[in-house]
Design a protein with these regions (language model features):
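Second-shell loop/turn segments in exported
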Residues: 39-45, 70, 122-127, 247-250, ...
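Bacterial Sec-dependent N-terminal signal peptides
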Residues: 1-25
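Conserved small/polar residues in nucleotide/adenosyl-binding loops
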Residues: 332-339
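His/Asp/Glu-rich, glycine-adjacent segments
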Residues: 89, 97-276, 285-292
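Loop/turn elements at helix/coil->beta-strand transitions in domains of secreted/extracellular proteins
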Residues: 26-30, 62-65, 146-149, 275-278, ...
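Short, structured active-site-proximal loop/turn typified by the sulfatase FGly-forming signature C/S-X-P-X-R
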Residues: 43-92, 149-153
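Mature N-terminal segment immediately following signal peptide/propeptide cleavage
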Residues: 24-43
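Extended hydrophobic/aromatic segments used for targeting, binding, or gating
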Residues: 168, 278-280, 290-318
Length: 339
């Protein structure tokens, strides 16, 4: 049974300032944005709440592929991201899910576990060893004789590593216990610019002051059921001890945190600064807060999409300032919309 991706498999977006002839044949930067839990029906249902810089710009100036499918079942973050960036199904790429039973040891293993490598800013040992084929980033590194700059940034470990592939220069994700951007020794030395970000502006310094409330007036949110707990909402993370970063990663602020590290990446690396094409693989989150039901958190999911729209707009503006959208190709897609 095939499962349809409820958003487009690839929505390709190339800004050309309305003059196609000014677009270089090879972009300086390719950005792959995978939005976890994104639903095309929600994109459409909440469209009246959006500004002009995010979804509407992508739809207006990009190309949308609507009739796309995953050619396998039991889709989750790992199997979907592996398939997106390898162009193959789990039968070939080896990643059948977030976790599975290892036949040799009869133990449950996670998709990016690898005891051969140490974690940086994390105790988790990680590599893409279970990916059995090359990825887009691997092929780009081969094609450029290793001269491309390839980085992956995501809230979750599996999305960061599987999108990065084998040959990227770094894959970074938010630590569930500390909020620091983490990595693996598999990718070599940990970049100084990420260490500096962690030490000076890490999430752990700011999370106590973050409060998530409605971005728009509550009367703007029309889809509120009788099961909704209240007519407004307010979530903060200051009282959480063990779960605050996990809950943070299911809030729209996780997408802003990705953008902040992208800003540092574009500032302190050579990404997009020469004619050798570079690749950034990014991940956002668009699911329910703390994985609760839509009925209970109907207002939050609408606000999630409003803030997601803003985050996409901020990302496009950031890339335009640092690299130039006329030098950039951006594609966005989503795994199947479920946890």
């Amino acid at each position: 049974m095939k499962e349809r991706i409820l958003t487009s498999l690839i929505a390709a977006f190339v800004i050309t300032s309305l003059q196609a002839q000014t677009t270089p044949a090879v972009p300086r930067l390719v950005v792959g944005l995978t939005i976890d839990q994104l639903r095309s029906d929600y994109i459409e249902a909440f469209s009246a709440l959006y500004g002009e810089r995010g979804f509407k710009r992508l739809m207006r100036e990009g190309r949308v592929y609507c009739n796309a499918e995953y050619d396998f079942i039991n889709i989750d973050r790992s199997s979907a991201v592996a398939s997106i960036y390898t162009g193959t199904t789990p039968y070939y790429n080896g990643v059948v899910g977030n976790r599975w039973m290892d036949r040799a040891s009869l133990r449950i293993i996670k998709s990016v576990d690898d005891p051969a490598y140490m974690g940086v800013y994390t105790s988790e040992s990680t590599s893409p060893q279970h990916l059995l084929v090359s990825t887009l980033s691997d092929e780009l590194m081969v094609a450029t004789c290793g001269n491309a700059e390839v980085y992956s940034i995501a809230p979750t470990r599996e999305m960061a590593v599987l999108a990065a592939g084998h040959a990227a220069k770094g894959a970074f994700w938010l630590n569930d216990e500390t909020g620091k951007w983490s990595g693996s020794t598999y990718y070599g030395s940990f970049p100084e610019w990420v260490t500096t970000y962690n030490d000076r502006d890490g999430l752990d310094f700011r999370i106590g002051n973050l409060v998530w409330g409605p971005y728009l007036p509550v009367t703007s949110y029309k889809y509120v059921t009788s099961d909704a707990k209240q007519l407004t909402f307010k979530h903060d993370f200051s009282d959480e001890r063990t779960e605050k970063y996990k809950k943070f990663k299911t809030s729209p602020y996780a997408n802003d945190e990705v953008n902040k590290l992208v800003d540092a990446c574009l500032t302190y690396t050579n990404v997009g600064k020469d004619n050798v094409p570079d690749l950034l693989t990014l991940s956002y989150y668009a699911g329910n807060y703390a994985h609760m039901s839509n009925a209970e958190y109907a207002m939050e999911i609408q606000d999630m999409y409003v803030r997601l729209d803003n985050s996409i707009g901020d990302l496009l503006d950031l890339i335009d300032r640092k690299v130039g959208l006329n030098n950039t190709c951006l594609l966005y897609t989503s795994p199947s919309p479920r946890d």
